[in-house]
Amino acid sequence: MSKNNYIIRLERKEEQREVENLVRESFWNVYRPGCFEHFVLNQLRNDDAFVPELNFVLELDGKIIGQVMFMRAVIKADSGRDIDIMTFGPIGILPEFKRQGYGKILLDYALEKAKALGCGAVCMEGNIDFYGKCGFTYAKDYNIRYHGLPDGEDSSFFLCRELIPHYLDGVTGEYKTPDGYMVSENDVEEFDKLFPPKEKLKLPGQIF
């Protein structure tokens, strides 16, 4: 896809470290001092659930400024069935290009490609204020619970979007984040040594 001066395409192997650094810049000191997301991306590329056909970068004037990647996941239905879905993330935009609409452009494109691959629904953790603009709503509206979250606890972070209409009709069940997203702090620290030094700061609004 190309329009005006940007293009969305698949990530190339030789760009992986550059894209990891992009993710590091995008998430640094946002949710916690430092970040984990660049290491998560590094690990997920080798995960069995990784979807290489949905591993996109957004290039502006020849410079990579954004990325998104997808993973296969399941909803464990109360009926005993596994409902095949996908999740995505990290999705990152370089700080100097945030709040200019590029994240939405990238995600909208990727979701259309996921639908073309036969993905019926996507679940993820995120902010409804942003992801609502991309068609997501609260997963509880689809009767999907978040694994390990007690009844009555705030689940407003847990979002879902059907890509195929009625795909989740009649489904009640539970979603668990794919295991590949779980990384250790020690492993992150070692991986981070491969990148230029950055100061970790405790800032207002961080959640970890």
Question: Can you say where each PLM-predicted feature lies in the sequence?
Answer:
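A short, well-structured alpha-helix characteristic of acyl/acetyltransferase catalytic modules
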Residues: 13-26, 170-204
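Active-site rim helix/loop that mediates acceptor-substrate recognition in acyltransferases
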Residues: 20, 27-74
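Internal, conserved structured core segments that host functional sites
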Residues: 54, 58, 89-92, 119, ...
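Conserved acetyl-CoA binding element of GNAT-fold acetyltransferases
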Residues: 80-95
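Conserved acetyl-CoA pyrophosphate-binding loop and the N-cap/start of the following alpha-helix
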Residues: 97-109, 119
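Conserved active-site alpha-helix within GNAT-family acetyltransferase domains
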Residues: 116-119, 126-153
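Cell-envelope/extracellular anchoring and linker segments
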Residues: 151-153, 157, 162, 197, ...
